[in-house]
């Protein structure tokens, strides 16, 4: 049996630990989590809580609890992955806990809905380069959007989890993506 826990990759370690304890007590074996939390353009400013501020977000303020996985870097002209404490390291910790509790994660790397950025955020990133008129469905056919997505996946799969010292592509706690 399994469940969906979209917030597992942006909450505190204590919250993640509690989710896994509860899931283990219920006999769950698979948890679907979001491996995407895409935001717009980093402004270089912070809010009153010290979190970075982003513009051109597909989903409200973009970040969730100060966590974001990708943002658009105007200087580079492409999305950049955040592997830090307020980024992919949250997914790393969830994978570590999944293995510790004998579970596996089904990781989504993007979504069609606007929540967490998704395909719509890729369209907004393209607008930053002057590529206009795209819709979410163009994610499947536009070479720029597809290239960015492939770069994201390649970076994730070859990223070494600091908790397990394994690349994501070698993590035994991954059920699927």
Regions found by a protein language model. Name each.
Residues 2-177:
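Active-site mouth of glycoside hydrolases
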